[in-house]
Design a protein with these regions (language model features):
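Catalytic-core regions of glycoside hydrolase
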Residues: 1-143
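Predominantly late transmembrane helices and immediately cytosolic-facing juxtamembrane segments
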Residues: 136-167
Length: 167
């Protein structure tokens, strides 16, 4: 099924003329415990979509060093491990780098923590920013749908402001 789907998807992408805007990813922050499963999945993704940009949010340099991902996207608190070592540095932030004065967009954070992102992007010559929480109006694991005007923390699982930007 996956090969048939990939073929049809690539045809659609080409018909729409958006090939240069499309990226694919294998997994979100694979852990070192999942290394061998990730390696198998990444190989399949490379076979199916290798002509596209393949990116993955991951913070273990080992995955990139061993050729499992072309474009790693480390969490902002791990950016120094990747700076100067990857061809095109991207980064992201999400619910867990809320300590150590790292930037993020949580509702309860001082505004400076939002604005320092520009300095970090400049300092490390970051070329892309992966934004996951655009419109995730669900509880963790998508078990329930939420009203973003009444509940801002994904059912108490994420810091308020992490799971969506659009209201």
């Amino acid at each position: 099924f996956l090969r048939q789907f990939a073929k049809a998807l690539i045809e659609f992408i080409d018909e729409q003329g958006i090939r240069d805007k499309v990226m694919f990813h294998t997994s979100d922050e694979p852990s070192t415990e999942n290394y061998f499963k990730y390696r198998k999945s990444a190989k399949i993704m490379k076979e199916l979509f290798g002509e596209f940009k393949l990116i993955d949010a991951l913070s273990s340099f080992r995955f990139f060093k061993n050729g499992l991902v072309q474009n790693p996207v480390p969490c902002i608190n791990d950016i120094e491990d990747f700076a100067g070592k990857v061809p095109e540095l991207w980064t992201y932030y999400c619910c867990y780098p809320h300590k150590d004065n790292m930037p993020n967009r949580f509702i309860g954070m001082p505004s400076l923590r939002n604005r320092v992102l520009g300095f970090i992007v400049y300092k490390y010559d970051v070329r892309g920013f992966l934004q996951w929480g655009l419109n995730f109006y669900n509880t963790q694991y998508s078990k329930e749908h939420i009203n973003p005007f009444e509940l801002t923390d994904a059912g108490g699982k994420f810091p308020a402001g992490d799971s969506f930007v659009l209201y």
